[in-house]
Amino acid sequence: MNKLFNIVFIAALTFSACSKIPVVELPITTSSPKALEFYKKAMLSEQVGDGFEKRQYLDSALALDLNFVMALEMYGSQDPIKLREQREMAKSLQNTVTDAEQLMLNIRNAYRDGNMDHALENAKKLVENYSDTYESYVWLGQVQSDRYELDDAIKTLKKSIELNPDSYEAYSLLMGHHIAAGTQVMLPEEKRDIELGVKYSDELIRIRGDHGFPYHFKANVYRQLGEFEKAKPLYEKSIEKRKGLSSEATAYLVSGHNFMFGGDLKTARERYAKAIKLTKTPNGWFNLNYYLLVSYMFDNDYIGAIEHIDKIEQALESKDFDEVSLLGRKATIHWQKMVCYAHNQMEEDAYSALEQGSIFGEKRADRKSVV
């Protein structure tokens, strides 16, 4: 029997681990209870940067329910063709799911279209229609943060925490207002509070102390302050907690940053090499090699940097890149070569690398338009 059902996590079934407060979650539509279990595990993996595991769980969910809209939407394939196909399929099935899911899809599509007014409109509707769910406030807080409406975002995210003291995403966004975290929008410098950021990081560790990412996040605070020795044990804890996971590579990567900025380039490169060895995807392999390249540039060793780029280039064909991605990587490599040659006063080689990079870039654009 494959009757469609909606799972709404009502207060009687879900409680905050912190204070036993009943927690209401947004409804998710699927034809399979087991698929929903996999989906929830996938979202927990995404929460802490385990993209590979997230996609594995979503593969399992989609094997049970091919039309699982939110699983299709949240999959995030690294294959651009598969990514587009899954997003288009999710969009085509949008009318088959709950109003809450439609609003979430609208928000994500608005981001892709660069229409932040539409994103805000839908996020506000989500809160209006599902004001008893902590997740709706996370969605709105994210949009408000990205619109630089930070005072509103802080109030919204604190409301999420009122409804669920274990709202990991809310604490993560609040911390990111004070501590640099990727591309997250931060408060103006005069309003940032390092101590408050550390307090939020401790909440992340309390909620997800089973995983290394919160330790990594807190270590970043000390690294950014130049307190490299204070950051080291937290990075080591992050590595320990991520053993066997795809994000173990990330743990070694950020630890490498700490050693590099602390002046220990030898250990930094050992950490970067370990991260590269552990990565599970072609994109991960390529991106992590970039940081090893930067370690040579950081040391003004442009010959060493060029030799490293040559090694990456030789290995590219053996990696499982699709054609468009491979051309893009080749274009990037030649741009990197150009920078290194230019810094080393090798003008002819720099121009040659620039020309080759342009050729690969044009080929990628042509191929992408066909695909």
Model-derived features with residue positions:
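TPR alpha-solenoid repeat register
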Residues: 71, 136, 170, 214, ...
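Conserved small/polar residues in nucleotide/adenosyl-binding loops
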Residues: 370-371
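Acidic, proline/glycine-rich low-complexity intrinsically disordered segments
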Residues: 18-171, 176, 198, 210-211
